[in-house]
Amino acid sequence: IKVLIPGSNGKSQGGDAPTLGVVGRLGGLGARPELIGAVSDGDGALAALTCALKLVEMHAAGDVLPGDVIVATHICPDAPTLPHEPVPFMDSPIDMETMNRMEVDPRMEAIVSIDTTKGNRIINVNGYILPVANDLMDVMTRVTGKMPQVFALSQQDITPYGNDLYHLNSILQPTTATTAPVVGVAIATEQMVAGCATGATHGSDVEEAARFALEVAKLFGTGSCKFYDEEQWAHLVELYVTMERYQTMGDAK
């Protein structure tokens, strides 16, 4: 599913406001017939589509954002499960390369990637893990009313699936298919919850994630929400060259 909500000065209308992508990441909404009901893993799609619906309603009511917003995700009610430590992963009937090709749109100039991140013990541009932008932390504080929380990543989390390395989850897999900056929004819990667990969706958490993406979209279209410091990024590349190798399969056979 891909939804384009045109902005008043969006590029789809001939304008020059930047385009934000909101990607809902998941294996599936359900694990039928093994499990009955919606699974925890589907929260990313639910949040992304909630954001899309709200943007469409706002647009119809005359509250039009400056820039285009493209929301993309996929719906699968009967996805398989996979063994994974410490709890089972939800698999998907489509591979990550296909998912990225369909969901990571080249028109997206920055991406908010929303994914359930409950099945672990912890709560990028061109292969670099960059500092979290102050603008995004300001939005998070405003939306949640709490201090911003940042989840830890390892370098291998931003490498493509299929290279036999452990990945936190698919939250930053869009980085492997774009040159745009990608920020992961993790829907997390205090205790580990398997992606295939039913009855584990917390409506308030999904709503906060959707509202965060919407608030970022409002600011991004005006140019007042930076995902990273462009001068620092340029100097980083000048000193250490690019890290695009991490967006590839490397020397995997």
List the predicted regions and their residue ranges.
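Alpha-helical metal-binding/catalytic segments enriched in His/Glu/Asp
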Residues: 22, 32-73
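Soluble metallo-hydrolase cores and metallopeptidase-like ectodomains found primarily
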Residues: 1-32
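Acidic, glycine-rich active-site loops and adjacent beta-strand->loop/helix elements
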Residues: 26-29, 69, 73-80, 191
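Active-site-adjacent substrate-binding region
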Residues: 100, 110, 116-250
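A glycine-rich helix N-cap at a beta->alpha junction
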Residues: 86-112
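Glycine/charged-rich beta-loop-alpha catalytic/anionic-binding loops adjacent to active sites
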Residues: 25-37, 121, 194-195
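Short acidic, glycine/serine/threonine-rich loops at helix termini
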Residues: 34, 80-87
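Solvent-exposed alpha-helices and their adjacent loops that cap or buttress functional pockets
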Residues: 8-16, 39-41, 61-65, 102-106, ...
